[in-house]
């Protein structure tokens, strides 16, 4: 039976009936590109959401947009992306701009990427906090840092043309959308690259079809390459017969014949047949092959029924109709290019018809599984976990496949699929529930999930994560583009433990100008400019700063930002920042944080009891005076130390004298042990021993405002030297105790004057709350950057660069760990023989 499902799907938000509230777009009478209709749709949707109408500010051009102003541009229909625009407008007011017409934008040759284009916006609807929006003109035009849009909309051809071959990250393109809309290509990716079950499929294609390689094989998909379908009818009949009689078709009684390819996407053109009707099936396939083009295919596939589970007795004697379930998932390319499931929505329909997007109102996964007879909560949770894993595997496979395409095939060197919809059905295979992947899309799942979230808010459900996750991903990619080509002055290269800096700088496109004391440092060949200058005697950092400024002037260097990741150089970096007029922590604040006794002495005046009693030691006389003020047991360590070198638990004055004598004898200057602060001298500190568990808190602070915080746990330290033994992330502490640590770390930084930067704070948590050990006025060292990136996604290095540029980093508002890491410390002196 031939079935045609064509035309608008009225329940999807993209096809809502619009009311014209304000008539034509201000200043765009008779707009031929449909901007008026799109603008009216935007106003109607804002009204339905209870938000104010767009304010027309186009008469007064907006000026002053520079290279550090972020612009995320959405091209095309406003409806699918409206929640994302509103969320992004709240997170970064004015950064999200909606472009409704090709006349609002222009393409100019890229200055940074030959052969590419920059997208300039002369007009757009920008979104602010509180759901406010404004129609604005931009003089000079704003340069887009990230572009996406409704590439799958057949009426939006101008969207694809504007977004083609751009020099900024582009979330999709028309060629990529066409690949997603081609059911055969999608199933090949899902089966061959993601190892997901798909309906048994026999596909006939014309010619070589290079987008469908023979390797790796796609389980469940049989590909037949035809040269002339009219002359190969016997081959077609043989393949159809073998498919219908094959083992893969044994569980199924019906098949579907349909054309596939992006031109056929959404038409619903298909015919359904019983498996026994071999002649009719072959005839239907042959009829479709007559009009086959090289971009299309003809599919013969099993009609996989939705699993039927035992249900409780019905309340009504009325017969139960067989139903079908479609599971719609939306996944985005999140931090570190990792797939992240954003939302799931289900639609239910009659079993004899395909359940399509927009044919029914969406509902939640958990309630749908309950309705289907999955009673046990643990089984429903297991299915939800499998669905997340399958969806994210599909996205990972798609990204890997796209990476193998040429820039022309992708629609640009910077074009990638950032938002992916994957449809599944719940089948029963060998008496077990199985998620079968059906198809992919670039827009329909987004619309369905947006509708599901709006419906939830209508009955008092809290806002979901979908708009936040998508807005954060877009803003993050825009910020990555924002830092490309920026000149960063780095003070101090550090050791091998900082090798990741050079790799990250290359990946982010940073131009590093390095000031380093070692003229033979390995990083000299990895940076844009190497400036050897011996600054190891840090007690003269004011003079060093003047010399560094002279070096920059002599080279004609004007960096956009200056910072240091190396503990010894943080004060010098702050002084150079001040001399250049760049953003960074004040030198006085860094000095307070760098010198441990000054840190605690400064914080003693604070009403919050985070500081620990301590005394500075420069002589044995100081030791005698300190033991009268600091109770034993106590901790003796270097005043400016790093890496726990020289730290020791002392039980009495004699042990303190002995430890101080050893340190003052063996550690005199930087040559004795580079990188542990001896350039500041070898003064010591005696501080009260604080019981409790030890933790690191890594903070991102911008203008005194906390943007991000991550708590990690340290295992019990090995006394008396307090060597770190283990660590884990995320913290095992309950949320309220982590909140105590974060608040204490933030208050300590603020009290010291550290208002801009990425800082690492070491604390102990006892029964009475947090106590400060020390503040490191730089990014957390050793494993912390890599671990935070692996577990949560954000990169502390990028965050530090953005803060130094004067741009508040976009970080996850509700960070959720993607994995758990635990590590055991191994030292060459202790474990070298065992590990050899």
Give each language-model segment a name.
Residues 69-72, 487-489:
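Conserved hydrophobic helix-helix packing surfaces used for dimerization/oligomerization
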Residues 8, 18, 36-49, 78-246, ...:
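Conserved N-proximal alpha/beta basic substrate-recognition cap immediately N-terminal to
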Residues 1-4, 8-16, 20, 28-29, ...:
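Active-site nucleotide/adenylate-binding loops and adjacent lid/helix of ATP-dependent enzymes
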Residues 1-61, 316-317, 335-339, 350-486, ...:
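ATP-dependent carboxylate activation and anion-phosphoryl transfer catalytic cores
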Residues 249-253, 271-374, 660-717, 733-746, ...:
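Phosphate-binding site of ATP-dependent enzymes
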Residues 80-84, 448, 496-501:
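Short N-terminal binding/cap micro-motifs at the start of the first secondary-structure element
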Residues 492-508:
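N-terminal basic/disordered segments at the start of proteins
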Residues 102-104, 515-521:
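Short, polar loop motifs at secondary-structure junctions
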């Amino acid at each position: 039976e031939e079935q045609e499902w064509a035309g608008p799907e009225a329940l999807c938000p993209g096809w809502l009936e619009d009311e014209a509230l304000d008539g034509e777009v201000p200043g765009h009478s008779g707009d031929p590109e449909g901007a008026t209709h799109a603008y009216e749709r935007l106003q109607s949707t804002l009204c339905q959401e209870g938000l104010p109408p767009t304010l027309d500010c186009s008469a007064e051009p907006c000026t002053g947009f520079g290279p550090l102003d972020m612009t995320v541009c959405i091209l095309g229909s406003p409806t699918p992306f409206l929640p994302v625009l509103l969320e992004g407008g709240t997170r970064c007011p004015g950064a999200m701009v909606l472009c409704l017409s090709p006349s609002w934008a222009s393409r100019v040759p890229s200055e940074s990427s030959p052969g590419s284009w920059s997208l300039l916006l002369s007009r757009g609807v920008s979104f602010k906090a509180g759901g406010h929006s404004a129609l604005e003109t931009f003089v000079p035009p704003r340069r887009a840092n990230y572009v996406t849009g409704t590439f799958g909309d057949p009426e939006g051809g101008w969207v694809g043309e504007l977004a083609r071959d751009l020099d900024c990250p582009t979330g999709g393109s028309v060629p990529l959308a066409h690949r997603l809309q081609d059911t055969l290509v999608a199933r090949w990716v899902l089966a061959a690259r993601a190892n997901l079950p798909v309906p048994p499929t026999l596909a006939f294609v014309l010619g070589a079809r290079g987008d469908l390689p023979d390797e790796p094989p796609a389980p469940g998909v049989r590909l037949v390459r035809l040269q002339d379908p009219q002359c190969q009818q016997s081959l077609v009949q043989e393949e159809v017969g073998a498919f219908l009689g094959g083992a893969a078709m044994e569980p199924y009684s019906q098949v579907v014949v349909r054309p596939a390819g992006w031109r056929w996407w959404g038409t619903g053109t298909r015919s359904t047949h019983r498996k026994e009707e071999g002649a009719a099936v072959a005839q239907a396939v042959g009829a479709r092959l007559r009009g086959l083009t090289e971009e299309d295919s003809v599919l013969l596939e099993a009609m996989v029924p939705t699993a039927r589970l035992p249900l409780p007795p019905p309340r009504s004697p009325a017969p139960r109709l067989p139903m079908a379930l479609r599971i719609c998932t939306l996944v985005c390319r999140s931090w570190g290019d990792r797939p992240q499931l954003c939302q799931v929505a289900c639609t239910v329909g009659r079993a004899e018809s395909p359940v399509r997007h927009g044919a029914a109102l969406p509902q939640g996964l958990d309630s749908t599984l309950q309705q289907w007879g999955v009673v046990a909560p643990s089984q429903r949770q297991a299915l939800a976990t499998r669905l997340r894993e399958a969806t994210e595997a599909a996205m990972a496979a798609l990204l890997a496949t796209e990476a193998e395409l040429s820039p022309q095939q992708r629609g640009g060197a910077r074009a990638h699929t950032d938002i992916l919809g994957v449809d599944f059905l719940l089948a029963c295979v060998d008496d077990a529930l199985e998620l079968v992947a059906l198809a992919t899309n670039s827009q329909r799942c987004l619309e369905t999930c947006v509708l599901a979230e709006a419906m939830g808010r209508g009955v008092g459900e809290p806002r979901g994560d979908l708009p936040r996750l998508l807005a954060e991903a877009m803003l993050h990619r825009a910020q990555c583009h924002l830092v490309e080509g920026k000149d960063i002055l780095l003070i101090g290269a550090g050791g091998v433990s900082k090798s990741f800096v050079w790799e990250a700088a290359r990946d982010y496109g940073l131009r590093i100008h390095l000031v380093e004391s070692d003229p033979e440092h390995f990083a000299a060949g990895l940076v844009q400019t190497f400036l050897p200058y011996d600054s190891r005697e840090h007690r003269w950092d004011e003079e060093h700063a003047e010399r560094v400024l002279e070096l920059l002037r002599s080279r004609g260097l004007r960096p956009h930002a200056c910072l240091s990741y190396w503990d010894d150089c943080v004060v010098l970096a702050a002084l150079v920042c001040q001399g250049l007029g760049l953003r960074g922590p004040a030198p006085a604040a860094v000095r307070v944080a760098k010198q441990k006794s000054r840190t605690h002495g400064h914080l003693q005046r604070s009403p919050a009891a985070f500081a620990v009693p301590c005394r500075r030691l420069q002589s044995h006389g100081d030791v005698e005076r300190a033991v009268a003020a600091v109770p034993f047991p106590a901790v003796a360590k270097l005043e400016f130390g790093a890496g726990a070198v020289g730290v020791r638990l002392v039980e009495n004055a004699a042990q303190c004298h002995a430890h101080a004598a050893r340190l003052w004898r063996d550690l005199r200057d930087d040559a004795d042990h580079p990188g542990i602060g001896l350039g500041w001298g070898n003064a010591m500190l005696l501080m009260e021993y604080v019981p409790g568990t030890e933790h690191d808190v890594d903070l991102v602070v911008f203008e005194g405002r906390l943007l991000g915080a991550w708590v990690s746990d340290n295992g019990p330290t090995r006394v008396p030297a307090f060597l770190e033994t283990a660590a884990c992330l995320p913290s095992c502490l309950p949320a309220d105790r982590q909140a105590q640590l974060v608040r204490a770390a933030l208050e300590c930084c603020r009290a010291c004057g550290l208002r801009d930067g990425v800082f690492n704070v070491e604390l102990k948590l006892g029964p009475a709350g947090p106590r400060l050990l020390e503040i490191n006025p730089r990014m957390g060292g050793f494993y912390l950057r890599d671990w935070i990136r692996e577990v949560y996604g954000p990169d502390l290095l990028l965050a530090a660069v953005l803060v130094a540029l004067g741009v508040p980093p976009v970080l996850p508002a509700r960070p959720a760990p993607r994995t758990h890491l635990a590590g055991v410390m191994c030292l060459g002196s202790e474990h070298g023989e065992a590990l050899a």
